[in-house]
Amino acid sequence: ISILRVLLKNFLIFFLSKLFSINKKINKEINLVDIFITSNNLSNDRYYKNFFLDKKLFYHVPTFVDLSLRKVASCLIHFNKRNYILKSQFLTFKDILYSIYFTFRVDKIKIKETFFKKLNIKDLILRELYLRRNLDASIIGIQNYLFAKNLKNKNIKLKSVLNWHENSAVDKGWNYG
């Protein structure tokens, strides 16, 4: 996926979220369930088998994966009727810019000589950073971190957070936040 496409997609999802979603009143203590939306068929939760869907104490926090903007808008309208919190409710435009600017900050990362079993892997690390693989996941991970940080700044206590903890950039943002 081209860098420009990833950046544009993140901007557009943020703006669609602001346009189509209702800011919900959130309790001061909440439970969050991290979910990935891969289609606009929202009647079947492929991760938790709808276990949390009707639980009033749990809020789903969706991340959109490989959806067209039309399908994202359709999902956003549906979320207004359910226990969903959108990250955009707690992220500012400045937060989105900061997460997207990661694309350019990565070039400024300085790597010291790094050895693994007497082999210098500095060039390998620099190459991986330069290729920007998983750029979208890195941006979403930063947004997840900022989302959690902003919840704390609004004095919202997280009683529990369920995420897949697959050690991906997306989950690391959740866990660090």
What kind of region is each of these model predictions?
Residues I1-G177:
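Catalytic-core helical/loop segments in enzymes performing group transfer/polymerization on anionic/lipid-linked
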